[in-house]
Amino acid sequence: MRASTVVLLASCIGMTAFPAFSQSPRPYTNKLAPYVASPAHVVDLMLEMAKIKPGEIVYDLGSGDGRIVIAAAGKYKAKAVGVEISPKLVASATADIERAGLSADARVMQGDVLQTDFTGADVVTMYLETKLNAELRPRLEKFLKPGARVVSHDYPVPGWKPARVETVEGRVMHTIYLYEIQLPKK
């Protein structure tokens, strides 16, 4: 999807209040994190742990097929934004959002999570590797306000102490980390 189409689509569906990217995303590679979808039961637990309230803004970093975005907007009535670098996954997720009738409250845009402005986000979800979480940490600290929640599937954010950790059994074990952004120490 071309950038002009994304901008036009965003303005048409009334979601222009969300911050834009500071730069064009780098070309798609899976070097940031490979695409692996979070199982439905893990998505449910991630969103339940985040305690999303209706109208809150949720960003899903590396949103893949958009399942977290769709669940956040559909079940929790959040304003949900996915950030995904793969144009094919963005197109697929956008089609799924439209089929679910959630275009007014959900979208997935093509972009690099390391260039994304999350200002205003109440919740950030992610299924990225620990190294990428470490690279994201300064941006999360810069853009997230006190009280915001970060939920990470399987990989911790180095240097942060989780407020809650849950292990989920299934075909494979999954660990969910919940972090709560605190006021800066003086």
What does each model-identified segment do?
Residues 55-64:
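Conserved class I S-adenosyl-L-methionine
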Residues 18-53:
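Class I SAM-dependent transferase core
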Residues 86-120:
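S-adenosyl-L-methionine
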Residues 119-135:
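A short SAM/SAH-binding and catalytic strip from SAM-dependent methyltransferases
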Residues 79-84:
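Conserved SAM-binding motif I beta-strand of class I
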Residues 7-17:
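Bacterial N-terminal signal peptides
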Residues 131-186:
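C-terminal substrate-binding/active-site "lid" region of AdoMet-derived donor-dependent transferases
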Residues 67-78:
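Conserved SAM-binding loop of SAM-dependent methyltransferases across substrates and taxa
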